[in-house]
Amino acid sequence: MTVLSHASAPKPLAGVRVLDLSRVLAGPWAGQMLADYGADVIKVERPGVGDDTRTWGPPWWGEGEERVAAYFLCANRGKRSIAIDIASSDGIAQIKQLVVEADVLIENYKVGQLAKYGLDAPSLQKLNPRLIYCSITGYGQEGPLSHKAGYDFAIQAEAGLMSVTGEKGGEPQKVGVAVTDLMTGVYATTAILAALYERNTTGKGRHIDASLFDVQVAMLANQASNELVGHTHPTRMGNAHPNIVPYQVFPTRDGHMVLAVGNDGQFERFCLAAGHPEIAADPAYKTNPARVKNRETLVPMLTAWMMQRDTAEWGHLLDNASVPCSPILDVEQVMTHPHLLARGMKLTSSDPAVPPMIAQPMLMDGQRLTSELVPPALEIGRAHV
């Protein structure tokens, strides 16, 4: 098996076995995180087909029948694959046999579907009371919408994210990646880790109910709090911020860049660097609440300043003044960014059969928490399960 990371990399979850019955992104993302932390993750897939995302291409890695979509590669590092038909009596028996030795099970079937096969949490926890069973669904195990299938795009719409994303007065927009799926995977992982820690004391597992809808509502963060506290009815503001000014995209002489002024000291330094210190002293703009109140007069003024210099010139000037700012890079530029390469966030191998990948973003004592196993071909690992 090809190595992606050093064998000495930390494996805090070594000895933990995970059955990953999930498909697509939210569940597999949680399984990959646990694998990166050292868990033994067994991906249970449909015979002959596998995870839906294996065919979500192009682009593809490999050729012919062995090719796999890049989408699948992003969420299945560190796993072994086994094909089981969970609707068959033999498949049900295999799952139950694996559950006896498992610590965690992750699934994202519709509510009640696995109960038809005796693979629901109560049934499997009778076989293994220590089992931590994580159910990931669109709307949760209970509630008036629990029966509905949930996809990231639909949840972004129904849970409020699209109402605050997009240009002011324009159409609602989804985010460029499936953030609701991804964050549900992260939240599910933290709940699983909490349950594993608790089990050290209680000796018992838990049934975790992870809902994309709940996660997306929680992710509204300050926008939800603004509505609950101030009844502000948050709306789309383009790249501006409802609570901070200036904190948005500005045009420059040769393009665009982000100016992210988070406090009054930074605003004062920005005005000084721009050659207009008197604006920072003006009571209409001196404090953030004043700038929020007067954004309609301030932002056009700053726009005129920003258009007088190139993006790189502003970057050099503001970096030296300790004013947060950034160029706007595309994904291709990010993949070759010197900082990304210096941090070891891009995994490559001298083996031409191994696809390039993005590493797990966490380090412990300077080492990446990244599994050494590449995403598996269908059924790779069955002999060792």
Give the positions of each predicted feature.
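Conserved PLP cofactor-binding pocket of PLP-dependent enzymes
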Residues: 283, 319-343
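Oxidoreductase and adenylate-handling cofactor-binding alpha/beta cores
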Residues: 185-206, 218-229, 271-278
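Active-site Gly/Thr loop motif
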Residues: 231-247, 360
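N-terminal helix-loop segment corresponding to the beta1-alpha1 unit
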Residues: 1-201, 349, 377, 381-382
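Conserved Rossmann-fold dehydrogenase catalytic segment
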Residues: 141, 169-178, 200-216, 235-242, ...
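Aromatic-enriched alpha-helical interface/lid elements that frame and gate functional surfaces
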Residues: 245-321, 325
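Glycine-rich beta-alpha junction loops
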Residues: 48, 139-140, 212-217, 254, ...
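Terminal low-complexity tails and localization/encapsulation signals of metabolic enzymes
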Residues: 1-17, 235, 251-252, 333-382
